[in-house]
Amino acid sequence: MQTLTPNADIFHAKRRRFTCNTHTSTLIPTKPLSVSPARKTNKEHLRNLENVLRTSSNSIDHIENVTSRQEKTTKNTSTSSLLGGLNLARIWPQMKAAVDEMSPKNLKRLQRLLSKSSEERSPKSKLGSKWRELHGLNNWAGLLDPLDENLRRELVRYGEFVQAAYHAFHSDPEGSPRHVALPDGSFKVTKSLYATSSVRLPKWIDDVAPDLRWMTKQTSWVGYVAVCDDPREIRRMGRREIVIALRGTATLLEWSENFRPNLVSMPEPKPDQSDPTRPKVECGFNSLYTTGDQHAPSLAESLVGEISRLVELYAGEELSISVTGHSLGAAIALLAADDIAERVPHAPPVAVFSFGGPRVGNREFADRLDSKGVKVLRVVNSQDVVTKVPGIFADNDKQGQSRNNGRSPGGIMEMVERNNPWAYSHVGAELRVDMKMSPYLKPNADVACCHDLEAYLHLVDGFLASNCPFRANAKRSLRKLLDEQRSNVKVLYTGKSLRLNRTFHDNGDVLPSPSSS
């Protein structure tokens, strides 16, 4: 009858004949041995157990002192083989999380995410007829929480169209026309878009700061219209897509328009100015969208004209119109979608995908968009204050609750919404992300970071569901986030980005936990 050692079931012999390494033991001969089957199992268990007892203290020290370069230099070889051969989670359950975070796989993944040359994207799926659901056919019911993987990819793609608009403007603020480097080579730009402010500044301001003249220009480039012209991509998406991308606030006059928060009535064929239930929108946003001058038509006229041309050009094809924007661009996107649905003959399905957008109009404006079949999906960061203005309600959830309670006859909130010039309402469906869910960003990130478009795309790429942690296999590179929001990235990763190559070679399989700082 065999006598088994305690915990012998943990260790399994890999072969029946083997030669020990240079570390000798009185229990283990240094020459190959042939033993009888009856004694073979016990001897192999003893060998494995003796190896573990001899090296266990070293392995514990290695785990507890993962940042000690001197210790790793002397013990790296033996420790690496031990970590690879033992089930540490079973021997020391409390070390499971630490071992997972220290794995070479995680370190290599972080190296890839921080690399300047690495820009990995999630693989695209064939959408086919599913594109209508992703475009809001059912108001994204069942697709937001948890977030559908195809919708996640689409949102990141739309955000990158807006980033291209930002880059095209800031690379040459005074240039016209300008080149737009699209993130998707299957699309081509068909029209540049310009917005004109109705605010006038004194001419002497240009003389004081001639190098910043672009900041005070009456008319500025705000985005573009692009259309997919790649047959293969059209087949993948299930239709030919027209994209309208609009950047956020950049010039002094655009900022001044942002601070005109009173509601104004939208143009109608036979307006009734005394009707308190008329659709109304923010004065400044409406001004930028509808104002033109002798040098350039209004953004509204330019956009409606181009979309009408494209719809006629591709008549008979399956089409869709996607309007996307960030910040000010998100606000103008709603006005543009409403205008297209109203004025473009035979308009295809229109959907808005916005990031960090403010409130734009009253409840009647939201109802008007819904009645026209315009679908709106707003991506909102819980810490972004821009999404909570303008308006008299600081908490949008309480706003909706108060509104429902105020629909009774003589309800106070109903009266406030109809008669107060600051009674704003959000539009459409909402995907809410949270800065605190990111393992890379500081939970107390500043206001600018909470509103930053790259931070939004980072959060969307890592979002699984409201009750789930950040996606472990997120593909989006952290390089741009580091470049633009370094002060808001956890110190661990700003340091790692500077010392990445050296750290990778020196530290081998060691990586601290993402949540440790």
Curated annotation (Swiss-Prot):
Result of knocking out the encoding gene: No visible phenotype under standard growth phenotype.
Presequence extent in this chain: 1-36
EC class of the enzyme, as a word: hydrolase
UniProt main location, coarse: plastid
Biological processes per GO annotation: lipid catabolic process
Top-rank taxon: Eukaryota
EC number: 3.1.1.-
GO molecular function, one term: galactolipase activity
Subcellular compartments: Plastid, Chloroplast
GO cellular component terms attached to this protein's record: chloroplast
Function statement: Acylhydrolase that catalyzes the hydrolysis of phosphatidylcholine at the sn-1 position. Has a strong galactolipase activity toward digalactosyldiacylglycerol (DGDG). Hydrolyzes triacylglycerol (TAG), but has a low activity toward phosphatidylcholine (PC) and monogalactosyldiacylglycerol (MGDG).
The protein's name in its UniProt record: Phospholipase A1-Ibeta2, chloroplastic
Organism whose genome encodes this protein: Arabidopsis thaliana (Mouse-ear cress)
